[in-house]
Amino acid sequence: MRVKHAVVLLMLFSPLTWAGNMTFQFRNPNFGGNPNNGSFLLNSAQAQNSYKDPAYDNDFGIETPSALDNFTQAIQSQILGGLLTNINTGKPGRMVTNDFIIDIANRDGQLQLNVTDRKTGRTSTIEVSGLQTQSTDF
């Protein structure tokens, strides 16, 4: 009887002891394993990297204008504003800069700007309708 019980017990426990394929997974991502650990490894490497490329320019190619450039632009804006104010009284105007020649005129209630590029000689005409002949104060 004992032998029968032992055989039955062995038959019951034998499915639990069937062998399967062994699979190994790395627990430490520094030694490989899951490809999802790539961002972790890249961040770790970048945190340890102290090399600075001497040719690297961090300003993205944007040049900040100098104080003289800002002043020149402000003066040109003031002069152009004055010309646009005088156009209401019927006085045409001209502004000459290093790059452009701007002619402003009132043609039958239309503001007409002729802009000539001094480097290429190309001319653009801008016409704005609805010009008021009398200025209003706000």
From Swiss-Prot:
Pfam families: CsgF. It comes from the Bacteria. It comes from Salmonella typhimurium (strain LT2 / SGSC1412 / ATCC 700720). Residues 1-19 form the signal peptide. May be involved in the biogenesis of curli organelles. Keywords: Signal. The gene is csgF. This is Curli production assembly/transport component CsgF. Coiled coil: none annotated. The keyword Cell cycle does not apply. InterPro entries: T8SS_CsgF. NCBIfam families: PRK10050.1. The keyword Signal applies.
